[in-house]
């Protein structure tokens, strides 16, 4: 009987140790201490630092779209080592995400299509760039057109 009691106590001890914070960027004072710190804007990333980090491997920005797991997102991994939490731009969407690009909602885990990110602030995503993108696409027309 004493062997089973020591096994139970060992299991309870392991459970108490396992309830520790597993996230590499847990703040001093535990998870609840985050509520006391003011949020800041997330780090810039991507080509020319035109984007903002939305997660450890997610970089989104105006006219850039979203980059996932590319070399441009490596800087976003540094965000895990900063003591204060950050808040990416855009309005709230999804479960805990924010609008990252037109029609795209991102959180720290990934991105998904979201209609609530299409409507609303047209200036937040640079609508004037749409004309430039269309002009850019028209320049890539096939050079050998058949004339009838």
Swiss-Prot record:
Record-level Gene Ontology MF annotations: neurohypophyseal hormone activity
Record-level GO cellular component terms: extracellular space; secretory granule
Cystine pairings recorded for this chain: 21-26, 42-86, 45-59, 53-76, 60-66, 93-105, 99-117, 106-111
InterPro entries: Neurhyp_horm, Neurhyp_horm_dom_sf, Neurohypophysial_hormone_CS
Domain of life according to the entry: Eukaryota
UniProt keyword list: Amidation, Cleavage on pair of basic residues, Disulfide bond, Hormone, Signal
Purpose of the protein: Isotocin causes contraction of smooth muscles.
Family: Belongs to the vasopressin/oxytocin family.
The protein's name: Isotocin-neurophysin IT 2
Organism (species): Catostomus commersonii (White sucker)
